[in-house]
Each structure stands twice: as structure tokens, then as C-alpha cells.
């Protein structure tokens, strides 16, 4: 990978933050956008502009081709068996909510159990909690090991006949551990259990093959993989998508309806895509897939892990950094900073780093159950991506050298 060449594709990297060159290390929250993705979005607004699936004129047909071409591109990106298994959404959160609401209402019964775990992002667990309040389903938790990982052994320990759904992230957004999804899927399907995967943090970094994983549903967002905001996709095995009824209704999802309330829905996936879709986002997402595949996600992942290991080596030498996920093979490093025997408030550390032009995440990272496991109210998270460099890691380490309570708090006064 030629990082210097890659960085030239990202115009935002020329800007400053706090009058310092931008060091963007918050890629777990969202990623920066390369020029080819920006161009794809601008091209839609400049030269296409029409709606999809609604016009009988040339420009509309061109939009149809681009929109449905993006569906085929997404099918290839995930190695789905059928293009009809790809439903466009506003992102991971919508996709996971759709699955939780449809499955709970249409397939589950009172007393059925959904297995989750305490490291989950809110978008992975809250939909099941809320949908279950009406249906009488309940959530149980896969115990995490001492590092905060899901293991097959711990998963087996909590399996009962009442478990009907397992809903987990393939990669934790806080700790970066990769769950043994393929092994869990095999066990699930031996027992007739649905497996729902939050792919928000795995899709940007790992080669995803949903047929090999054998999950039933898989959701991801474009904005975490160099694509536009407000768009993503839900993969669902065709047998489930064909069986499930949508929860939203409107234009394009129906074939016909009449005054007697008779309704005929369109086939999968259109029955799940009511209303005008984020067309420019879908086209931009396909451009992001082209961009990442041209570089190779195996190269991207290796680069991220190298940056993390470089950070860990430097952090150990400092002696004031507490790392919570040292052994996770990802580009996520979650840490706190000590000043003597006192842990500095994570948000204060992040605000202090901002004065150096460094962007990291702080707090609970939308995983509100995990602080109890980690025994800390919050953490800082640096998340590396394809355009980050060792020089940027050096800048982060140099700033953390002088991160004391006094220095972190003094920026507010």
C-alpha cells in the first residue's frame, strides 16, 4: 500500500483542526471520503438527478441502471447468493431495527430468548429489547471472557431450547475483537436459531463472505467504509426476506392496492424499500466498494494492525497508558491515561488531544453495558484506517506524554 498516494485521494486531509494539521483517528465513528466517492455523488446530482424505478424517460432509466448496478455491486462485495438478498437502508441501525421488529413480531413468541452480549453497540441490542417489550421475548447474555471477547465455549454455556435468535457484532466497536461468527452460525443452524450480525465494524476492514459465514442477516453502513452518510445495506437470506412482511409501506414497495385495503406487495427486495431511496448515497457506496477493493481489504487490515502494534509499543514505553484490548487484531485501540494513581476523565483527554489537531472518540462509544465489564466509566478510542500513518501515531504518543489532569483540565479555563 502506498499510503502517501492514498492520502492524496482524501481532500479533507489538507485541512487543519485547532490550527494544527488534522490527525483523524476516529474512523470507528465514521471515515473520511475519497475523491472518487465524492465524484460519484456529485455526478448523480450534476448529470442524473432523476428518481429510481419511476420514470419512462432516458435519464430515469440511467438512474435505474446505476441504482440496480449498485445492488449487484453490493451483492458481489458481500458474496451474497442473490442480488435480491440486498436491501438498501439508511445504515446499520435501520437494518438491525428492521430485522428485530420484523422477526420479533412475525416469527417469535412470548418467552423466546435473544442472545446478545455486554459489548454490543446500542443499535445491535436496543431494537431487540424494545421489540421484546410488546411480544414478551427476553434478552440473555453470552458471558465475555477476561479480555472482553465472545468465545464459542461461553456461547455454548448459555444455549437453551428457548434461544431463537443470536444478535451480535462481528467486530466489537469498542474492543475490536472478532467474534467466531462462522462457528456460532453452525451451532445456531443445528438448533434452528437465527443469526443476526452487526457488520458495521467488520465490513470496512475484512473481506466478508456471507455465504461462508452462513449468517441469516448482516447489516452495515457505507459511512464507516469511505462511503456517504445515511446509506447502508441489509443482507438477508432470500428465504427469510421472502417470508417476512415489511414494517414500512409506501411508494414503490407495492404492486397494487384498492379501497377495500387489499394490498399486493412487490417481490423482495423492493417490498422493503418504500419511498425514494438515498440514490446518490447508494451510488456513492458502490464507488466506495470499488475504491476499497482496488486497494484490497487484506492490505488495509494488515496496515491497521501494524499501526496498532506500533502504538502499543510506544504506549508501553510511556507507562501512563492503560490499554483494554491489547490482543485484538484490529485497528481499534481503547485506552485511558493515568496521572500518578488517578485515571484522567476520558473526555478531558480527548479535548486535550483536540488542541493538537488529533481526533479520537471518548466516552462509552454507544456500548452502555460494557463500562461495568471494563470497570471504568469511559475510555478513549483511537481507530486507524487506510490513510493513517506511523507519523500520526507518533503525534498521538507525543501528545499523550504530557496528558496530566492539570494539562487536560486547563484547556477549559
Task: Give residue spans per PLM region.
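Pyridoxal 5′-phosphate
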Residues: 1-413
Amino acid at each position: 500500500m502506498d499510503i502517501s498516494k492514498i492520502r492524496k485521494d482524501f481532500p479533507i486531509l489538507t485541512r487543519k483542526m485547532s490550527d494544527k494539521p488534522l490527525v483523524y483517528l476516529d474512523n470507528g465513528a465514521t471515515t473520511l471520503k475519497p475523491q472518487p466517492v465524492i465524484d460519484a455523488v456529485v455526478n448523480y446530482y450534476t448529470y442524473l438527478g432523476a428518481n429510481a424505478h419511476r420514470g419512462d424517460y432516458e435519464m430515469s432509466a440511467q438512474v435505474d441502471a446505476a441504482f440496480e448496478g449498485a445492488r449487484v455491486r453490493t451483492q458481489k462485495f458481500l458474496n451474497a447468493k442473490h442480488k435480491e438478498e440486498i436491501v438498501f437502508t439508511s445504515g446499520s441501525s435501520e437494518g438491525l431495527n428492521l430485522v428485530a421488529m420484523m422477526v420479533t413480531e412475525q416469527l417469535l413468541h412470548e418467552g423466546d430468548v435473544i442472545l446478545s452480549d455486554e459489548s454490543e453497540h446500542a443499535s445491535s441490542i436496543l431494537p431487540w429489547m424494545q421489540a421484546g417489550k410488546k411480544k414478551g421475548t427476553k434478552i440473555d447474555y453470552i458471558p465475555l471472557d477476561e479480555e472482553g471477547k465472545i468465545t464459542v465455549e461461553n456461547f455454548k454455556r448459555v444455549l437453551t431450547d428457548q434461544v431463537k435468535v443470536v444478535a451480535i457484532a462481528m467486530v466489537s466497536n469498542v474492543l475490536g475483537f472478532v467474534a467466531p461468527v462462522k462457528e456460532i452460525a453452525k451451532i445456531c443452524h443445528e438448533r434452528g436459531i437465527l443469526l443476526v450480525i452487526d457488520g458495521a465494524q467488520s465490513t470496512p476492514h475484512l473481506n466478508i463472505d456471507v455465504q461462508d459465514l452462513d449468517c441469516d442477516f448482516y447489516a452495515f453502513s457505507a459511512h464507516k467504509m469511505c462511503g456517504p452518510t445515511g446509506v447502508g445495506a441489509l443482507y438477508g437470506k432470500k428465504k427469510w426476506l421472502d417470508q417476512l412482511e415489511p414494517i414500512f409501506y409506501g411508494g414503490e414497495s407495492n404492486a397494487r392496492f384498492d379501497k377495500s385495503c387489499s394490498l399486493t406487495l412487490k417481490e423482495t427486495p423492493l417490498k422493503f424499500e418504500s419511498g425514494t431511496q438515498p440514490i446518490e448515497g447508494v451510488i456513492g457506496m458502490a464507488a466506495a466498494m470499488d475504491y476499497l477493493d482496488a486497494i484490497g481489504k487484506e492490505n488495509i487490515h494488515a496496515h491497521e494492525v501494524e499501526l496498532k502494534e506500533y502504538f502499543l509499543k510506544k504506549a508501553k514505553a510511556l507507562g501512563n497508558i492503560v490499554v483494554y484490548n491489547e490482543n485484538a487484531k484490529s485497528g481499534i485501540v481503547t485506552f485511558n491515561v493515568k496521572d500518578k494513581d488517578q485515571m484522567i476523565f476520558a473526555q478531558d483527554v480527548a479535548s486535550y488531544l483536540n488542541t493538537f489537531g488529533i481526533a479520537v472518540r471518548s466516552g462509552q462509544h454507544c456500548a452502555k453495558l460494557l463500562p461495568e465489564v471494563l470497570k471504568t466509566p469511559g475510555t478513549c478510542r483511537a481507530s486507524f484506517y487506510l490513510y493513517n500513518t506511523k507519523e500520526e501515531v507518533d503525534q498521538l504518543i507525543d501528545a499523550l506524554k504530557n496528558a496530566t489532569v492539570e494539562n487536560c483540565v486547563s484547556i477549559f479555563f
